[in-house]
C-alpha cells in the first residue's frame, strides 16, 4: 500500500527537470541525490536540462519495463522493496511540472521528499516557467518581425509592379503617337493636292460673289435707266414739271411704268410696295394715289433703297423726311451703288462692319460673306422675314378694304382724264400757313400722309349740287365722334402704357380725365404729372417740355379751377365751363377748309384717300357740268360726309398719332365751293383749303398749339 500511494503521488506531482539526472543515476539514494540535483541545476542550461530530462525519462521507462519482465517470478516482498526506489523516479520525470497542494501534502506525509527539496523544486519550477515565458515572447517578437518583413517585401514588389505598368503604358502611348504622326505624314505625302483644291474652291467662291455683285450693279443701272425714261415720258405728257435743280421725284409718287407686277415685286420690293391697280391709275389718270393705301404699312420700309432726291422743296410738309431719305439714298446710289452698303457700314444682316470706302466693302463682302453655309442660312432667314412682312402687308391691305367697305365707299377705279387737274389735298399747307406758323410739326417717317402730284391745267370747282344737306352731315359726324375719352383709353390702356405713342387728345382733355378719375375729383399738380407718366409711356420722356404745357393749360383754361385746401393747392374741373368750351368748338359756322394739320392719324389718312378718290371720280365730271348726274352727286355727298368727319375729329393742337381712335375735341370745318384766286400763274383755278374761325376758337387753338410746340422742342 505504501508503494502504490507513493507511485500515485509521484505520477501526479511535478518535479524540477534540472535535478532529474542525479535521481535517475542513483535510484537508491533519494535524499542525497536531491541535494546534488540542486547543485547541478545552476551549471546546466535550461535547454540542455530539457534534453537530458527527456533522455533520462526514456531510459528510466526502459529500465522499468526490463525489470518488470525479469523479476516477474520473484517474491512480492522483493518487488515491494525495489518499487519505491525505481518507479516513482521514472514516473516523476514524465509527470507534468505543476504540483497541486494535495499532492504536496501527500509527499510530505509519506516523507518521500524533504521540505527543503520541495522548496528547491518549487523555485526551480518557477525559474523554468519564467524562462519558458521569455522564450515564448522572444519567439512572438521574431514571428512579428518576420511578418512585417514579409509585408514590406510584398508592398515593395507591388510598387515595382505598378511602376513597371506605368512605364509600359507610357511607352505604348508614345508608340501610338509616333504611329499617328507617321500616318499623318504618309497621308500628307499621299495627298499633296488637298490644300491646292481648297484654295481653288475659295477662289471659285470669290469669283461667284464677284459675279453676283456685278449682276446686282447691272440691275441697279437698269432700274435707274427705266426710272429716267419714265420721268421723261411723264414730263413730255405734261403731267409733271421738273425745275432745273431737281433731278428726280420720290419713288413713292412715281412707280415704275412698263414693268409687270412680278418684276416690280422682285426688283422694287423694298422701294415701292405699291399695288398694280395704283400703277394703272398713274398711267391713265395722271393723279398720284399710290401712297394713300400703302403709306400706313410701308412707310418704314421705303427709305432703304430709294433713288436720289435732290430737290429741297416741301412736298406735303415732309421736307425733313425727304432730306433724311435724300441723304441716305444718295450715299447708296452715287458713291457706292450697292444695297448692302450704306453710311460706311455693311448692311448684311448681323454684320454692321465699318468699311471706309466701297473697295474695302467689296473686299469685306467677298471675304466674310462668301457662298458658304452661314451666308446661305442668313439668306434663308431674310427670305422668311420678307415673307412675314408680305403676309402682314396683305393683312393690312385687307383690313383697309374692309374699313372702306364699312364706310360705304367702294374702291375707286382709275379713269382717264383728258384735262389734268390741279388738286391740292386737304393735308397740305398753304404758303400763308408756312409763313405764319413756324412751329408746324415736322413729319415723321411713320406718319401716313397723302402726297400731291402738281398738275398745271384745267380749272375745277365743286358745284352746289354736289354738297347737299351740309348741316345734317355735320350733326351726324358730331354725334359719331362725340365719345368720352375713357371709352378710348380703357380698351387701349396697355397699348398707351407700353407704346411710345402720343395719345390723340389735347392736354386739356388729358388733365380733365386725370382729375375725373381721382376719388375726390381733385388733384395736385404733382398728382397730375404722376397720372400722365403712369398712364402714357409717351410722357415718360421730355418731362420739362410737357410739364410746362400742362401748367400752361391749367393756368389759361377757364374750366380748370385752383382751390386751396388742407392738402395745399389742388385743381378741379368746372364741367359747365368745359362743356361750354366744347360746344363752342362743335357748333361753328360753315367755313372754308383751312389750316389742316400736317400730322394725321390713321382715320385722317383714310379720309385723305377718300378725298383723292373724290378728285379722281368726280372732278373730271365736274369739268363738264352737263355730265353731272344723280350718281355723282350721291358719291360726292358720301365723300364729303367722310371728309367732314375726319376734319371734325382732328386734334385742335394739330397733333395726332397713327393708329389712334377719333378725338373728343373737334373743330367744325366744312368744305365750301368757292372759286379762289390763283396764287401762281401756272395754276389759274384750283381747290385751295382755307378756313375762318371765330376769335374764341382762335384763342383756344393758340392755347393748345403753344404747349405742343414746347413738347416737340
Curated annotation (Swiss-Prot):
Question: Which InterPro entries does the entry link to?
Answer: FH_FOXP1_P2 (IPR047412), Fork_head_dom (IPR001766), FOXP (IPR050998), FOXP-CC (IPR032354), TF_fork_head_CS_2 (IPR030456), WH-like_DNA-bd_sf (IPR036388), WH_DNA-bd_sf (IPR036390)
Chain intervals with Acidic residues compositional bias: 697-713
The Gene Ontology terms for molecular function here are: DNA binding; DNA-binding transcription repressor activity, RNA polymerase II-specific; protein homodimerization activity; RNA polymerase II cis-regulatory region sequence-specific DNA binding; zinc ion binding
The cellular component terms of Gene Ontology attached to this UniProt record, alphabetical and capped at eight, are: nucleus
> Where in or outside the cell?
Nucleus
**Residue spans with biased composition (Low complexity)?**
290-303, 436-457
Q: Which residues form the signal peptide?
A: none
Location of region: Leucine-zipper: 386-407
Instruction: List the Pfam families.
Output: Forkhead, FOXP-CC
Q: Please note every region of biased composition (Polar residues).
A: 1-28, 313-322
> Which intervals carry biased composition (Basic and acidic residues)?
324-335
Swiss-Prot/TrEMBL keywords: DNA-binding, Metal-binding, Nucleus, Repressor, Transcription, Transcription regulation, Zinc, Zinc-finger
Question: Which stretches hold the DNA-binding feature?
Answer: 502-592
PROSITE patterns for the chain: FORK_HEAD_2 (PS00658), FORK_HEAD_3 (PS50039), ZINC_FINGER_C2H2_1 (PS00028)
Per the UniProt entry, what is one GO biological process?
A: caudate nucleus development
What domain notes does the record hold? The leucine-zipper is required for dimerization and transcriptional repression.
Q: How does it assemble?
A: Forms homodimers and heterodimers with FOXP1 and FOXP4. Dimerization is required for DNA-binding. Interacts with CTBP1. Interacts with FOXP1. Interacts with TBR1. Interacts with ZMYM2.
Q: Known PANTHER family for this protein?
A: FORKHEAD BOX P, ISOFORM C (PTHR45796), FORKHEAD BOX PROTEIN P2 (PTHR45796:SF9)
The UniProt function text for this chain reads: Transcriptional repressor that may play a role in the specification and differentiation of lung epithelium. May also play a role in developing neural, gastrointestinal and cardiovascular tissues. Can act with CTBP1 to synergistically repress transcription but CTPBP1 is not essential. Plays a role in synapse formation by regulating SRPX2 levels.
For this entry, the protein name equals Forkhead box protein P2
Species source reads Pongo pygmaeus
